Amino acid sequence: MTLWVGILVGVVALLIGVALGFFIARKYMMSYLKKNPPINEQMLRMMMMQMGMKPSQKKINQMMKAMNNQTK
């Protein structure tokens, strides 16, 4: 009888740990993405305009492709 109780407690503790870990990781990633949003085409266009460059769609596509290749 005590063996089954031990196994049951272990399985329940494992499930609680997995669920708790999932929610903690989810909250961390949401706050991280809120503080550091991924760069999109609109942000690149604004950065280029601030640097005094005229942002053409070809240049923006090249920069997006280069950044995507860099993260792989």
Swiss-Prot record:
Taxonomic superkingdom: Bacteria
Organism: Bacillus subtilis (strain 168)
Recorded coiled-coil stretches: none
Keywords, comma-separated and alphabetical: Membrane, Transmembrane, Transmembrane helix
GO CC terms in record: plasma membrane
Membrane topology: Single-pass membrane protein
UniProt name for this protein: UPF0154 protein YneF
Subcellular location: Membrane
Transmembrane segments: 4-24
Listed InterPro entries: UPF0154
Family: Belongs to the UPF0154 family.
Pfam name, any one: UPF0154
